[in-house]
């Protein structure tokens, strides 16, 4: 179900912003839509309930967030194409950028835009794949009308909320399964 919802949201993104992009939309830079921020070291934080994201996904849970708002996480080192959308308090490690939105209703647009880019091909590292804020900030992106962004948000936000709810339910069901299996085999 979650994959299907994400595919629907991505299809809508392509339909609205690629196939039917308005010629009136100007081309701008990513820096006009988001501020790209560096993640920070997490090793001195105590365990808690806040997810810590690295380029491979959630690494652990800590006591406090680095950022508490909607964000798009972009790998700085490693798996450069593993773009992550987050809409809950989180911590981002120092090998992962996070973004602060400068405009309303742009996070999911930016998420799908970045997923459509081959960031791995923009690698500036030698031994380890690497990304820079300068490169991300300079990415050329169409700046859609506010009404188009609002319409997109109103359609895909419920999809993202359903995905989030489903992920919580899956985690609970896995815990029940593990408990029951443990009882069955003990």
Q: Positions of the model-derived regions?
A:
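Non-catalytic DNA-recognition/assembly elements of restriction-modification systems
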Residues: 1-54, 142, 146-186
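DNA target-recognition domains and sequence-specific DNA-contacting regions of bacterial/archaeal
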Residues: 26-144
